[in-house]
Amino acid sequence: MKLEKLVGERFKERPADCVIDSHAIMVKGGYIKYMANGIYSSYLPLRRIVRKIEQILREEMDKIDGQEVQFPVVMPAAKMVLGMTHEEAAVHLVREYAQSYTKYPFMIYQIQTKFRDEARPRAGLIRVREFTMKDAYSFHTSQEDLEQYYEKCHAAYERIFERVGVPEVVSVKSDSGMMGGNISHEFMLLTPVGEDSIVLCDSCDYRANMEAAENISDIARDAESAALEKVYTPNVHTIEDVCNFFGDETKNSCKAVVYQQNVDDKYVVLFIRGDLEVNETKLVNFLGEQVHAAVITEECGLNAGYIGPVNLKVNGDAVVLYDKSLEGRNNLSCGANEAEHHYKGLDMERDVPNAEYHDFAKIQEGGICPKCGKKTVKISRGIEVGNIFQLGTKYTKSMNMT
């Protein structure tokens, strides 16, 4: 076909609404056309590229004994008519077939248009409401067999990205989130315009996304502990204000971050080192419940800006948690649970003897690598281009296949 006959407009100038280069190139070159927020039509040049990518996907899935199927887009559910993924449909498709152990293992896959009610579409095709996905589902009779096949899938994905020619794709340990299961990996394309934070180590091969990366604290306990002293601190509310008032660093403070559980509005008070941020994915996984930022009222008994672990009182049922960054620490500043008052000289072992500690913190640039122990952690940006999970029996058990 001659170029003059090719449907679609091509432009010399960069479109003003294109923030990143890839979006601008596709619009300028006549690959896509904007229809609505997060929704694009594609012209012939892009369709040819997509078909080639799909062929690579099929070849690599077939190499590991995958069988291509097609699930319906519409699901028999009142609230979720359009299927986000098809775990339930996959179990439904093979449940009667897989009655004998001789049928296992096997894998089915499809390439299909997916839909997301995306709240913030952005950057052309990077975050959209409609896109093409290859999703695969494997079935096994043992955990050992699942783990062996998982490695085959991991290798297949690496071959796919190599054949497609995508540069700098790294496999990182990830949180399974709503998908369930215990083990998962994301394949991340490293790019400054990426939305996800990726934890890399310059000294070893450790890779993880921010949600799954363990935070390790190495701040030692002081040789001597000062006495716990309540201090009048007028107009001091934030952790930065507190540390400035006492002339100390934020790493030597204990701050409270308060949430409420979505299911029952129960308060969750989390104490963490003052210079760290809460990794809310870790918190949700620990609680088994979704949370939101708390609305602190007079009735709850908490004194916003002055919450501390000593003599903490919350009206009603509440969950009180402590991050590992506070374990063994002493000579800290914290809230005194009284307006315009803070403590200095907090010793966690002495003043909060029954505290149990868990990892709820985000790892920081230059932090300690969980694998090699060196302070060579680097935080990069990336775009998720693939994901694999070990889901276990979450779906097969709930649908009476096991």
Where are these regions (language model features)?
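TRNA-binding/sensing appendages of the translation machinery
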Residues: M1-A77, T132, Y137-G177, D275-L276
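Hydrophobic alpha-helical hairpins/lids featuring a short glycine-rich hinge
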Residues: A78-T113
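Extended, low-hydrophobicity, polar/charged segments
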Residues: E87-R95, R120, L125-A136, E144-T402
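Conserved oxyanion/phosphate-binding beta-strand-loop segments in alpha/beta enzyme cores
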Residues: M1-Y34, D65, K103-V128, G386-N387, ...
